[in-house]
Amino acid sequence: MKTVILFGFLLALLGYLEAEHAQSDPEFTAKARQMLAVFGNSEVDRYTKSRNLPALIEFYEKYSSRLPLTVQDRTYANNVIRRYRAHNNQQVDGVPAQGGVGVVFALLLPFAVSIVEGIAKAIRE
């Protein structure tokens, strides 16, 4: 009897996981297209791109396993995110530091380029 219950539980779990995976595909595609529209478009200004960097980082953290990146690109991206967070967590007199968007943007630009290339490849597959 325990085997039947365990088997039923495993079937239910597999069904749930399959349904979850099927739902995430349209979400991944929609968010990937949104990131491409901002970071893959040369006509989008620098301010808009810098304003959308947190969304790109969130996208990368959520879907990094689905992006076809090299080990070197993945390591670089993780290091850049760590440095970005450290920069954003700096405080001056107890309040978050102001400005420095140019420094952060210069740091994240190669990261954004490699992620956008990975997104474009993932959408084509």
From Swiss-Prot:
Q: Quote any Pfam family the record assigns.
A: Turandot
Question: Could you say which protein family the record assigns here?
Answer: Belongs to the Turandot family.
Q: Which key words are in the record?
A: Immunity, Innate immunity, Secreted, Signal
Which processes are annotated in GO (biological process)?
cellular response to heat; cellular response to UV; innate immune response; response to bacterium; response to heat; response to UV; response to virus
Q: What does this protein do?
A: A humoral factor that may play a role in stress tolerance.
Induction context? By a variety of stressful conditions including bacterial infection, heat shock and exposure to ultraviolet light.
Q: Which InterPro entries match?
A: Turandot
Q: Which residues form the signal peptide?
A: 1-19
Gene from which this protein is expressed: TotF
In terms of superkingdom, the source organism counts as Eukaryota
Q: What is this protein called?
A: Protein Turandot F
> How is this protein annotated for GO cellular component?
extracellular space
Subcellular location, in the record's words? Secreted
